[in-house]
From Swiss-Prot:
Residues 1-33 form a transit peptide. It is an enzyme of class 1 (oxidoreductase). Monomer. GO terms for cellular component: membrane; mitochondrial inner membrane; mitochondrion. It comes from Sus scrofa (Pig). It comes from the Eukaryota. The modification Phosphoserine is found at residue 551. GO terms for biological process: electron transport chain; response to oxidative stress. This is Electron transfer flavoprotein-ubiquinone oxidoreductase, mitochondrial.
Length: 617
């Protein structure tokens, strides 16, 4: 059945139906020590317990409406909006009628966007050459660029030489959420149909196996998996080409990697978790345009990570500060959130924050694999852009510019194929192979290739400091043209050591002025989900968190989650523990899906509009 998409913009259509997977049978044990207790059902999502095997769903109308478009884009971040904008720019230039639909799971554009962010404006200026006249929110050019190594008590300054990737001359400090909101306005003005509050949950396929489009998930489902009286089926969006711009570790991209074997010829992706706060500080300490990065304390040399402090010129003395920890860390006792809070007490950091007020908090995973981890980008009916495949320049600590350029190149490649008079396709869904070729011939590919060895050079005996030495010698001499390519260590989920082989980390208690507890931090993210819905953090096997993760790794999920989603709590009866999932706290960072040593957690989309409500993060 076909209906205008705009008529479906109601809460009943604000989430997506996830792909079904094999039913997992309930295991027999739920305690750390006892094997006599039955496992409580922790997650009830219909991806685990299919509805066609649930009598409560008998007689429920499962018909879905469908809409047709030329191009469907999943995700309204910098990459997705760049692709949408460029498609409509080209359509206007060539007087072509092109329907472009963009869906975004956040309640409004920018609400799930989090980055530092120090923006290299190259791709942005290519897409919007008149951005100044249009009032784009690039208000803070970099005026001072600093880098340092932290010891427990001191900061050792390191000069930033011209030509090194961390040089920020010509860049802008931005609030990326505000920037993508502005980009959304530009896209809509060109005729892009932007639908916030719609979460893509299912990939649709043609009979020949090519991608047909996506479907939004159903709404009106109880926490126990039963339909509510308000149940409404999701919506299908069909397209000639579907662009997946979900951001880092997209849940649909995970399925595409397996379906089309897109990672057959690349290394596993490796990630970091970025935690960020926004402060209003004493105006006397405010240095608009100052950019400050550090490595070192409180992390040891074998744990990749670092920090940033960006002074924003937004009409008030704003400071964006954050901390990144590589998710290939080995100690299961490590808590990225608590390392962040401890870092703020360093003698070179704390004075800037004293007398200030924290006004926002958030977290998001980021790609760190770089050139070696880029998968195949195209497949019949679709392609990957932005942080979904992973185009972040790690030593530069930037990925927005490369994400935007990938979106622009994808749009140009798709437009050429859609408007070709000799259009030929072996599959029903168009296979736009030109996109990958164009990307490899662009400055994006050259930039990522040149820095490919810097992140993996930190795996040696000297750790992060070895990586700095490598950068200072080999990158300075060869400019990325050295005749070798270093490898990563493998998947981040395989890197944890057993708890018995590691030293517990004692973290200081937060003081409530500089450092804070987790729950008060999550409250500043604006995170909210419909409570009575199946948990979107699903478990393949309900026994694994206690029987394996807790017994071997001391329950690392209770530490690597930056939102307090996972807790091991005592059983109501008997000895032992059970895992409690506080799904309503989830900030959609994807860390659990990445770092879980058992790969038992599968993140799927909740009802559309749920999640964090960032304001210019």
């Amino acid at each position: 059945m076909m209906v205008p998409l705009a008529k479906l913009a109601s809460p009943a259509y604000q989430c997506f139906h996830a792909l079904k997977i094999k039913k997992n049978y309930l295991p027999l044990c739920a305690t750390r020590w006892s094997s006599t207790c039955k496992v409580p059902r922790i997650t009830t999502h219909y991806t685990i317990y299919p509805r066609d095997q649930d009598k409560r769903w008998e007689g429920v109308n499962m018909e879905r409406f469908a809409e047709e478009a030329d191009v469907v884009i999943v995700g309204a971040g910098p990459a997705g909006l760049s692709a949408a904008t460029r498609l409509k720019q080209l359509a206007a230039q060539h007087e072509k009628d092109l329907r472009v639909c963009l869906v975004e799971k956040a309640a409004h554009i920018g609400a799930h966007t989090l980055s530092g962010a120090c923006l290299d404006p190259r791709a942005f200026e290519e897409l919007f050459p008149d951005w100044k006249e249009k009032g784009a929110p690039l208000n803070t050019p970099v005026t001072e660029d600093r880098f340092g190594i932290l010891t427990e008590k001191y900061r050792i300054p390191v000069p930033i030489l011209p030509g090194l990737p961390m040089n920020n001359h010509g860049n802008y400090v931005v609030r990326l959420g505000h920037l993508v909101s502005w980009m959304g306005e530009q896209a809509e003005a060109l005729g892009v149909e932007v639908y916030p509050g719609y979460a893509a949950a299912e990939i649709l396929f043609h009979e020949d196996g090519s991608v047909k489009g996506i479907a939004t998930n159903d709404v009106g489902i109880q926490k126990d998996g039963a339909p509510k009286t308000t149940f409404e089926r999701g919506l299908e969006l069909h397209a000639k080409v579907t662009i997946f711009a979900e951001g880092c570790h997209g849940h649909l991209a995970k399925q595409l990697y397996k379906k089309f074997d897109l990672r057959a010829n690349c290394e596993p992706q490796t990630y970091g978790i970025g935690l960020k706060e926004l402060w209003v500080i004493d105006e006397k300490k405010w240095k608009p345009g100052r950019v400050d990065h550090t490595v070192g304390w409180p992390l040891d040399r074998h744990t990749y990570g670092g920090s940033f402090l960006y002074h924003l010129n937004e009409g008030e003395p704003l400071l964006a500060l954050g901390f990144v920890v590589g998710l290939d860390y080995q100690n299961p006792y490590l808590s990225p959130f608590r390392e962040f809070q401890r870092w703020k007490h360093h003698p070179s950091i704390k004075p800037t924050l004293e007398g200030g007020k924290r006004i926002a908090y958030g977290a998001r995973a980021l790609n760190e694999g770089g050139f070696q981890s880029i998968p195949k980008l195209t497949f019949p009916g679709g392609l990957l852009i932005g942080c979904s495949p992973g185009f972040m320049n790690v030593p530069k600590i930037k990925g927005t510019h490369t994400a935007m350029k990938s979106g622009t190149l994808a749009a140009e490649s798709i437009f050429n194929q859609l408007t070709s008079e000799n259009l030929q396709s072996k599959t029903i869904g168009l296979h736009v192979t030109e996109y990958e070729d164009n990307l490899k011939n662009s400055w994006v590919w050259k930039e990522l290739y040149s820095v490919r060895n810097i992140r993996p050079s930190c795996h040696g005996i000297l750790g992060v400091y070895g990586g700095m030495i490598y950068t200072g010698i080999f990158y300075w001499i060869f400019r990325g043209m050295e005749p070798w390519t270093l490898k990563h260590k493998g998947s981040d989920s395989d890197q944890l050591k057993p708890a018995k082989d590691c030293t517990p980390i004692e973290y200081p208690k937060p003081d409530g002025q500089i450092s804070f507890d987790l729950l008060s931090s999550v409250a500043l993210s604006g995170t909210n989900h419909e409570h009575d819905q199946p948990a979107h953090l699903t478990l393949k096997d309900d026994s694994v968190p206690v029987n394996r993760n807790l017994s071997i790794y001391d329950g690392p999920e209770q530490r690597f989650c930056p939102a307090g989603v996972y807790e091991f709590v005592p059983l109501e009866q008997g000895d032992g523990f059970r895992l409690q999932i506080n799904a309503q706290n989830c900030v959609h960072c994807k860390t659990c899906d990445i770092k879980d040593p058992s790969q038992n957690i599968n993140w799927v989309v909740p009802e559309g509009g749920g999640g964090p409500a960032y304001n210019g993060m």
